Regions:
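Elongated, amphipathic alpha-helical interaction scaffolds
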Residues: 1-241
Length: 241
């Protein structure tokens, strides 16, 4: 299939489970409120975001200080100076957990300059949306109601969580299998859109009635609503994916 045919066959709504679709929605600063709303449905209460003051995608982030090349989908800093790495991982990758920690530690390291004290460090959160399921020791513990895992420093015997430093959050979207009728909460409806946006022909009536973050998320996925520059970039990204 040539590039012209690909452009002709663009779906009317982006697929949020693809890297290109995810980036089209969440790397757009006009959708900052959507990113905040989605993250606040996932993050622990102590990490709740009121606003984002810094916003950069992977094309702009060049300051991670290690020799190995790092590719970050989206990096945000809130008004409390907490850093959030947000990414879509479309396919399984070896040592993925290690990569997440590596990326987070690079940004954690950058928070201090020479002579600054460690109390000036702020938490770094990695939020990875996975379009596949991780391998778990006990698969029975993970299902459509339990598909988000939270990883941080914990004392083994007591279970006491250390002061927030680096946290890794995995969202295993393929474990979310609820039908529309089973989606009752805002959280459920949001992930139903994540799983099904690529198949929408128009914004469903139930989303129009629901409003809130679900409606904003669905509206942001509509390709016809993109401005000329964004649509062209999306088309190019789709041809190259």
């Amino acid at each position: 299939m040539d590039n012209f045919e690909k452009r002709q066959q663009l779906a009317p709504f982006v697929n949020l489970r693809s890297d290109v679709g995810f980036k089209a929605v969440f790397a757009d600063r006009n959708n900052k409120d959507i990113l905040i709303g989605v993250l606040n449905q996932i993050l622990p209460p102590e990490a709740r975001i009121e606003d984002i003051k810094e916003y950069s995608d992977r094309e702009q982030r060049r300051d991670v200080p290690y020799g190995k090349k790092t590719v970050l989908d989206l990096v945000c800093v809130d008004h409390d100076d907490n850093t959030f790495i947000v990414e879509m991982q479309a396919s399984e990758e070896d040592y993925f957990f290690e990569r997440c920690v590596y990326y987070a530690s690079g940004l954690y390291h950058l928070e201090l300059s020479d002579g600054e004290r460690y109390k000036g460090l702020h938490p770094v959160y990695v939020v990875s949306f996975l379009n596949y399921s991780l391998r778990h020791d006990d698969e029975s513990l993970w299902d459509t109601d339990h598909f988000i895992s939270y990883w941080h420093f914990t004392e083994k015997r007591t279970g006491i969580v250390a002061n927030q430093t680096i946290s890794v959050i995995f969202v295993e979207m393929t474990l979310f299998t609820k039908t529309l009728e089973e989606c009752v909460t805002e959280f459920d409806k949001m992930f139903y859109i994540f799983m099904n946006s690529g198949g929408f022909l128009k914004i469903p009536e139930w989303i129009e009635k629901t409003g809130g973050i679900s409606r904003r998320l669905a509206e942001a996925c509509e390709v016809a609503a993109f401005d000329k520059e964004k649509k062209l970039k999306y088309e190019i990204d789709k041809m190259n994916e």
